[in-house]
Structure formats: structure tokens, C-alpha cells
Amino acid sequence: MKIGITGASGVLGRILVDKISQQGYEYKSFEGDIRNISDIQDWVDSSFPFDVVIHLAAIVPTSQVRENLGQAFDVNSVGTKNLVDVLNEKASNCWLFYSSTGHVYKSSNEEISEENDIEPISEYGLTKYAGEVLAKKNFKNLCIGRIFSMYHDTQNPPFLYPNIKKRLEEEDLTKFFELYGAESVRDFLNAEDIADIILKLMGKKPQGVYNIASGKATKIRDFVQSMTEEKLKIVSLGNKDILVANIDKLNKLINE
């Protein structure tokens, strides 16, 4: 199997590349600017014919997206349209995996299935859903993976996990520990597990939308507390919202 991958230098991308290499697949990473269609054309032209393309390239941190929404749309939405346009022209038979997010949904007290209404909880979710729409409209052999709350030891700030690690190392934990969204509930999954799921999807090559998550609800305060043996005096700040996936559709596919 011959694989093309965008976003290979990111946390999930590096893990996927390692796993792809271990399985003996050939791959070619995209190292250009996804906003530049000629960079994508050059990449596809200079590579072997792709059986699979895994599209991870994106601006992800919600704070960065809020600060520069125009750039985020250019990368996450227009960049995706650029990719599918080139693939339609030069590799229309390949299977495309588009990495989206659980942020395309609104907060819900119930588990969120792929059939739930779309109402992005963040600007990041809005940019990724726009990418979904553009990809679905312009490419047939497409699988969209809506990844919920990813964490990994190699992440850097401003993501939650590395931010909390840094605070736990630097702050006096005998004092009150202020935490925005402490009462919010998320569906956390390690990037290693996410990469394994993507590889399983790659083996099946389904079309359609799949939630990629653990299916388990965890309060952010509990996730943070699990990172230290010190009993934290957590002070909750900000609003509460809930994003927990129903993963029945995913489990049914990968367990067939």
C-alpha cells in the first residue's frame, strides 16, 4: 500500500508515520503549504501513485484559531479543498481520510452520534466542518474521522495536557488551582490509540463519517487530577459544556 500523508510533522502525524513504517508501507509526507495548490500538485506528481491519502494538516489549537480565524479557514477549509481538487485530477481512485473534530457538534448531555446536528462548539470546529463540506462535495472515496479530545506526552502548549503538565511542575500545589472549564466533560483518547484507529479504518477503507473517541465521559477536573498524586484544590472557572462520543458505528466497523 502506498500512502500520502499531510501534517506528518504534528503529534498524530509523527505517530502515524512510525506505525506506517513499522507495517512496511511506503509513504510520502507533504512538506509544502496546503494553501498553495501548486505545492500539492508537485507533491502528488513527484510521488508514487497513492492508494491512500491521510489528511491531518490543520491549525488545531482553539486559541490560535480564535486569534487568526482567517488563516485557520485558509488552512483547514480552503487547504482541504485544494487537496481534494488535486486528488480528483491526479489520484481520483485513492481513499482519502480527513481528520476532523468533535468540535463540529454542540454541547450535549447525551452521547453524540454521527447523526447529531452540526452546531460547532468552537471556531476551530467551524473551520473543520467547512473542510468536511468541501471535501464531501468534491471527493467521493472519503472517510471523515471526527476526533474528540486527543492528548499525548509529546504535545506542546497551548493544548490542555502540556499546559497542565507545566503548571503542575511550576505551581505551588498546596494553593488553590484555578482551572477554566473544570466542570466541563470531554472524551479523552491518547494519540497512540487514535493512530491505531486510523490504521484500522485504512484497512477497511469505508466511506462516511466516524467518531474517533473512547466513548467515556471524563470531567476535565478529574482528568487534571489524574495527572498528579497531589490532591489539588481545584477552583472551577468559566462555563460548562459536554462533548462525549457515541462510538457504536466505529466499533461495529473495526470489529467486523
Which residues make up each language-model segment?
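Glycine-rich NAD(P)-binding loop of the Rossmann-fold in SDR/ketoreductase-type enzymes
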Residues: 35, 71-79, 118, 122, ...
